[in-house]
Amino acid sequence: MSENKITYIENAVLGEGYYSIEHKSGLRIFVYPKEEYTSTYAVFGTKYGSIDTRFKRSDRADFIEIPAGTAHFLEHKLFESEELDAFQRYAKTGASTSFDRTCYLFMCTGNFKENFEILIDFVRHPYFTEETVRKEQGIIGQEIDMYKDSPEWECLFNMLSAMYHKHPVRIDIAGTKQSISEIT
């Protein structure tokens, strides 16, 4: 695709619509204009979640296996850089990981372009050191312990584990303490 393809999709019932943009790189972008809002939100979502633990590259014959919890680990780490922690700079940032998606978001009332460029930069240029990886492993380990205090969460993953003996959906989105310790 040499040019961006822009389509406006309108919902007659709601009386509003959005733009669907197919960027020449293949990235899909959705813009929902809301003139009455004073805040602007941006979400960068990718089709990469907790079940994506096995990959095959086009230049290799074998599969690459990564530890359970890697998508969630990256969700935590991608808001950091050597110079900047996005959570310290912006009041409203967030991220989430599901079985098949990871999303990064921010809200601002000004400087949208600068904020958006920073979000894209965090995703495109991750920052890792041995120290920050170890620190995050500890934080996620505590998060895993916290999930164990939730009967609903434990029930869900006990059920998934009983239903799916081999599929990665049976493993907690955050991984296990063992699997996150394998992330280097």
Regions found by a protein language model. Give the residues of each.
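His/Glu-rich zincin catalytic helix
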Residues: 1-85
